[in-house]
Amino acid sequence: MASKDWNNMLSGRLYHAQDSELVAARLRARRLVFRYNQSAPENESLRRELARELFGQMGEGCYLEPPLRCDYGSNIRLGDRVYANFNLVVLDCAAVTIGNDVLIGPNVGIYTAGHPVDPGLRRQGLEFALPITIEDGVWIGGHAVIAPGVRIGRNSVIGAGSVVTKDTPANVVAVGNPCRVVRPVTEKDREVWDTGENGEGPLSHGPKANSPG
């Protein structure tokens, strides 16, 4: 049976992170993460096995470059074909749901965890957490930070170094600190590439004007 603090954590209420059940769950995650990060580069089968044990759900064709960090792992649900570059940090004190075909750049932080603004509550050791959802087809650039309670809509692009503190709609490019929508994703983003017959041709006029950073 889950403890009161575990239930409070997953429900967006204040909780004590030093609850014995939470401490034990974090230790379990750290052991699995340690083994994952220390695995030999060629031992992909071991990493897949460890990831399936660590995460609440892991779809087909996922690959997360080590090293990675998370708090619990069990609150993370990955769709199919998720790719994360080096140094992903996920503070999954609340649910983190990542859809299919999501790309995550290096040094990205996904943080469900927060602390009260009131210093008295902080001194009591109270924390809170809010769920994060990253929908299908999203690309998150390197060094971006996703704050508690955020939803990023389908196929959107988050520019490198952005700090996402509010929901981002589907099919947009959003950049900055705080992150703001700068334009929609359109057919021109496909047309910028002169792919030729085999889909591997050179750039027609360069992607820089259309890049999120």
Predicted regions and their residues:
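Short-chain dehydrogenase/reductase
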Residues: 63, 139, 157, 173-175
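Short secondary-structure boundary/capping segments
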Residues: 6-7, 54, 124, 131, ...
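Beta-rich strand-turn-strand
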Residues: 141-167
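Short, glycine/charge-rich beta-strand/loop segments that flank catalytic centers
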Residues: 48-49, 67-69
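Terminal amphipathic alpha-helical/low-complexity segments used for targeting or macromolecular assembly
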Residues: 1-61, 179-213
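A contiguous, mid-protein "functional segment" used to position or interact
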Residues: 163, 169-181
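Flexible, glycine/small-residue-enriched loop-and-beta-strand segment within the central core
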Residues: 68-151, 177-195
